């Protein structure tokens, strides 16, 4: 039996995230949902973002209302930096610089049940999507804009920026179709010249998202890069 193809990983970028960082106290609680599809492991990415409860003041200070995705950056007891993205929800009456997350998740991420972290509006995060979503994305190309409801983020628009397959071969905006081709390149994606004017024939994928049902595991599209589309002037 052939190996199951892993779900498509989507990397989302927010060009309006900014640089504002707030130091917060993070408390682990039992009454916040934490399911297997919210976990990130070595084998798989999250299908849904875990939930973080924040005060209204912090929600507004970090301008989370536009997108609602918060990153917490922890330092583990052994000094390792760990970043976890969350779907932010306002809890009325919560102390201004306190964030509540699931107790089990906090233990996995920070090795503590209560700790401090840097909180900021997420600049980028990633989720995995099932094949039925991948199928709906099939046929779209680099530069196309689609509705965020397709990936569980209604009210937002996303623009496709590129992607790579399981072997690291990138999608190329100048190549039509969804197959793999060898083309002469003078620059990225697919080739980074060391000398001025240098060109090389390299393998790239076409600019179109393929239907996953027709792809082999070893060469399937593995990652799609998208950006929140606020308007062409911001991209």
Swiss-Prot record:
Keyword hit for Transferase: no
The answer to keyword Transmembrane helix applying to this record is no
**Cellular component annotations (GO), alphabetically ordered:** ribonucleoprotein complex; ribosome
The annotated region (Disordered) lies at 190-212
Q: Which Pfam families does the entry link to?
A: Ribosomal_S6e
* Record-level GO BP terms: translation
| Entry-linked InterPro entries | Ribosomal_eS6, Ribosomal_eS6_arc, Ribosomal_eS6_CS
Query: Origin, by domain of life?
Result: Archaea
Keywords, alphabetical: Ribonucleoprotein, Ribosomal protein
Q: Name one GO molecular function term.
A: structural constituent of ribosome
Q: Which family does it belong to?
A: Belongs to the eukaryotic ribosomal protein eS6 family.
Q: What is this protein called?
A: Small ribosomal subunit protein eS6
Q: What is the organism of origin for this protein?
A: Aeropyrum pernix (strain ATCC 700893 / DSM 11879 / JCM 9820 / NBRC 100138 / K1)
Q: What is the lineage of its organism?
A: Archaea, Thermoproteota, Thermoprotei, Desulfurococcales, Desulfurococcaceae
Q: Which gene encodes it?
A: rps6e
